[in-house]
Amino acid sequence: MKTSAQQAIRDIQHFGEEGGVVPVIDVASTSTFMDPRDMERTFMGELQGCYLYSRHSNPTVNIFGQKVAAMEGAEAALGVASGMAAIACAVEQIFRNEGGSGGHIVTSRTVYGGTYALFKNIFPTRGLSVSFVEATDLKAIEAAIRPETKVLYAETLSNPLLAVSDIRAMAALCKKHKLKLVIDNTFAPMMVRPLELGADVVVHSCTKYISGASDFIAGAIAGTKEFIGSLIDVNTGVVMLTGPVMDPRVAHELYMRMDHLGVRMKAHSQTSLFLAKNMAKEKLPVIYPGLETHAQHGLLKTMIDEAIGYGGILTLECADAEQARVLATKLQDEKFGLYAVSLGFSRTLMSCSAKSTSSEIPESERKEIGLAEGLLRFSIGYTGDDQVMWERFMKCYRSVVR
């Protein structure tokens, strides 16, 4: 029987001191060697498994990594300081491992705005060129591949347009052209396991669903033991040498919260589907991958754990940015949600993507990819009564959109 992400997380078990049911937090920045020669061998890469310095490795961060690895079906995982650190370090490490002399990346035109800015404005200064293509068009992806291409980067569900990546097909392309497939699974933890579908590396912004409380900035990278080990190599590891490490206190808190991540994701999904179905009945311009009317609903259905559902993100297109602002203000006043970026919080968060998390993408390109100025992205929470929240939503919507 295949082990679900929920069961895999459940089976990670660490005891605290004196048999405590909660593991201790190890906040030491440096560790003692009983034999000076062991320190020397560690620095030379001859001795593995020793704690040296917390920029290299930390026991509490490591046990959090074990839970992320269990969730993703990975050999190993590493917690880092943020989701952007996870993306940057994972991609740069691949190029370092492949020779480190520059190269080329193919990615989606509809990625998160911060990712777009990193790829467009920072990576080229480091010798990495990037082609942005339509991620749902496999022919366009293959046409963009060059001899120097090393990475295909995509999101399980694109942010904010909710296009679904065909990870199996992408993996086949990567195998054919000897590329590494990196998938940002931030929108779909517990729902989708990209590594099982053929991806090589998975990254997360743990700030979102894994935290669930909008109180930490954190990220994670999952993959093979060899790849995760390369990230913290004392001589060539991008995480080790650039330093975006996870605080052990954050790692401990996230380790504990992952036990109920599955319960939370189910609740996000259930409420989102309820609201999306009601919006669809009212013929509102809603996009949610759990609706059968979504262009790639069938594809996503072949990838998800249906016990978890289709996630907690939906979008609604308003006439323009001003109408979106007015609607969001009314919704906040009526306590439907909070006008704030990010996602994965227990309460609903709303933002106008073109004016916030996708503002890094030039307006001309936003028009080309269909990201309307009035698009409202909702990260649906699970607190309160669904029917009451729906009634509040429609009261506000009808007062704005007549």
Show where each model-derived region lies.
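A common structural junction motif
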Residues: 239-242, 331-344, 395-402
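Short, well-ordered beta-strand elements within core beta-sheets of diverse protein domains
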Residues: 254-263, 311-319, 377-381
